[in-house]
Swiss-Prot record:
Membership in a protein family: Belongs to the V-ATPase proteolipid subunit family.
TM ranges: 14-34, 60-80, 102-122, 141-161
Topology in membrane: Multi-pass membrane protein
Record's function text: Proton-conducting pore forming subunit of the V0 complex of vacuolar(H+)-ATPase (V-ATPase), a multisubunit enzyme composed of a peripheral complex (V1) that hydrolyzes ATP and a membrane integral complex (V0) that translocates protons. V-ATPase is responsible for acidifying and maintaining the pH of intracellular compartments.
Compartments it resides in: Vacuole membrane
Site (Essential for proton translocation): E148
UniProt keyword list: Hydrogen ion transport, Ion transport, Membrane, Transmembrane, Transmembrane helix, Transport, Vacuole
Protein's recorded name: V-type proton ATPase subunit c'
Residue ranges that the UniProt entry lists as topological domain Cytoplasmic: 35-59, 123-140
NCBIfam families linked to this entry: V_ATP_synt_C (TIGR01100)
Assembly behavior: V-ATPase is a heteromultimeric enzyme composed of a peripheral catalytic V1 complex (components A to H) attached to an integral membrane V0 proton pore complex (components: a, c, c', c'', d, e, f and VOA1). The decameric c-ring forms the proton-conducting pore, and is composed of eight proteolipid subunits c, one subunit c' and one subunit c''.
Topological domain ranges for the Lumenal compartment: 1-13, 81-101, 162-167
Annotated source species: Neurospora crassa (strain ATCC 24698 / 74-OR23-1A / CBS 708.71 / DSM 1257 / FGSC 987)
Length: 167
């Protein structure tokens, strides 16, 4: 009887809810960052396209980089979801795993939000400046890469945390 009580204290019934909150945090914040980056840089591309339609293909780089942010969040959400199981399946899901998965989701989600914000602003102003001065392109791409790396840092931390939750 004491064994069952100790097990339920370490693995309460609400522990999977916290893990699912990690999935939601990863997808909500990561997708919001990707959407902001896509929308903001898309506005700049639309402005450039009216004056210089020949530059549109080169100016799509910020939009592609914003989409990658959502892929980072999707990868972490799928990894967290693989550790969850339905009640009664005999799978042990502890409170530690729940909080670890919440930390995974928040780390990739919030860094994805920051990266998307960075990519959106740099993409918008960068493509507008590129229309006027072609030498700005290399600098714009470098700044976009540094913005993308913010999301990659969150992905790396989330992957490390996820492996720690497996014991």
């Amino acid at each position: 009887m004491a064994e069952i009580m100790a097990d339920s204290e370490l693995a309460p019934k609400f522990a999977p809810f916290i893990g699912m909150a990690g999935i939601a945090a990863a997808m909500i914040f990561g997708s919001a960052g990707a959407a902001y980056g896509t929308a903001k840089s898309g506005i700049g591309i639309a402005g450039v396209g009216t004056f210089r339609p020949d530059l549109i293909m080169k100016c799509l780089i910020p939009v592609v980089m914003s989409g990658i942010i959502a892929v980072y969040a999707l990868v972490v959400a799928v990894l967290i979801a693989q550790d969850l199981g339905p009640p009664g399946s005999g799978q042990h899901y502890s409170l530690f795993n729940g909080f670890m998965h919440l930390a995974c989701g928040l780390s990739v989600g919030l860094t994805g939000l920051a990266a998307g914000y960075c990519i959106g602003i740099v993409g918008d102003k960068g493509v507008r400046s590129f229309m006027l001065q072609s030498r700005i392109f290399v600098g714009m791409v470098l700044i976009l890469i540094f913005g993308e790396v913010l999301g990659l840092y969150g992905l790396i931390v989330a992957l490390i945390l996820n492996t720690k939750s497996k014991g």
